[in-house]
A protein has these predicted regions:
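N-terminal anchoring/stem segment of glycosyltransferases
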Residues: 1-67, 78-84, 251-278
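C-terminal catalytic/acceptor-binding lobe
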Residues: 196-278
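Conserved donor-nucleotide/metal-binding helix-loop-beta segment in metal-dependent transferases, i.e.
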Residues: 97-138
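Catalytic core and acceptor-binding pocket of nucleotide-sugar-dependent glycosyltransferases
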Residues: 141-233
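A conserved donor-nucleotide-binding helix/loop in the catalytic core
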Residues: 59-91, 99, 189-198
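Active-site regions of enzymes building and remodeling cell-envelope glycoconjugates
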Residues: 49-62, 74, 114-116, 223-227
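Short, solvent-exposed loop/turn segments at secondary-structure junctions
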Residues: 11-13, 44-45, 61-62, 95-97, ...
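A structural signal for short, well-ordered beta-strand segments and their strand-loop junctions
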Residues: 38-39, 88-92, 117-118, 159, ...
Length: 278
């Protein structure tokens, strides 16, 4: 029987999602496998902590965006326990497992050279790489030129064999600390780092469709196996991230549309001409 480490961070307001996550993933996710839940939280107690498979780990809440950038370091605090398991998977707090997901459809396939498991980000599943929101800042360790990259993956569900996942965490934690020292914040934080790592290891991961990362209320041609719950129905997301709302002018909207829909063609041609690479 394969052993699965379920890595879950729920600090602050995100603890509201834990009960439904536990209930649906215990019932539907990888039946026949032994699941161990590692819950990193600042809550003094959580639901189901009496279950021997639930391990509550004290974790102070970081301010935004360190709360996402520091994920790899958080996981590594439990390295000795995690390396004893066969597979490790990280899940965003607001996920719920709607359908039964079998090991055959989800786990990496070693016979095909796969050690990691990644999921397509639903906003980009049908777009060309030049339109992906990779980090384009050459000063950032997550930088990807416009002429590079193959897939755009979600930062909120990923994993693999314990050895491969922990090796990835160590490398991405090193890069994150380098960015922090240099005063650089990746565009989408841990997700930008994950996409750079995927671009460097294109044959090393199993890529799942957005069926396994299906935002609540969206309409896509995929089954709804793992649902991403709308956080704004539970708390003020902008307040948690210390974001303020700004009204954009007509000219700003037009410029943003140009940058999103047309500018990538020019930048991709430039990077090809300059023969940029990872």
């Amino acid at each position: 029987m394969a052993t699965i480490g379920m890595l879950y961070i729920c600090t602050g307001k995100y603890t509201v999602f834990w009960p439904e996550f536990y209930e649906t993933f215990s019932r539907n996710f990888l039946p026949g496998c032994k699941k161990e839940y590692f819950i990193f939280t600042d809550a003094p107690s959580i639901a189901y902590e009496d279950d021997p498979a639930v391990h509550r780990i004290d974790q102070p809440a970081y301010d935004w965006p360190l709360s996402t950038m520091k994920r790899f370091a958080i996981f590594l605090t439990q390295e000795k326990a995690l390396e004893q398991l066969d597979y490790l998977f990280f899940f965003n707090a607001n996920l719920t497992c709607r359908e039964v997901i079998t090991p055959e459809e989800f786990l990496p396939r070693p016979q095909q050279g796969e050690q990691l498991l990644l999921v397509q980000q639903p906003g980009f599943w049908n777009k060309k790489p030049m339109f992906y929101s990779y980090d384009r800042n050459p000063r950032c360790t997550a930088y990807i030129p416009y002429n590079c990259g193959r897939d755009y993956v979600s930062g909120g569900l990923n994993g693999g064999t314990s050895a491969a996942f922990l090796a990835m965490c160590k490398e991405l934690d090193r890069r994150t600390e380098q960015d922090i020292r240099n005063g650089v914040v990746p565009l989408w934080h841990d997700e930008s780092q994950l996409n750079r790592y995927a671009a460097e290891h294109p044959g090393n991961y199993r890529l799942l469709t957005p069926a396994y990362w299906y935002p609540e209320g969206w309409q896509m041609p995929f089954e709804q196996k793992i649902i991403v719950r709308n956080k704004s129905r539970y708390f003020d997301v902008a307040a948690v991230k210390h974001h303020s709302q700004h009204t954009r002018s007509w000219l700003q909207c037009k410029w943003e549309a140009f940058c999103e829909n047309y500018l990538p063609y020019l930048l991709c041609a430039r990077d090809k001409l300059l023969q940029k690479h990872l």
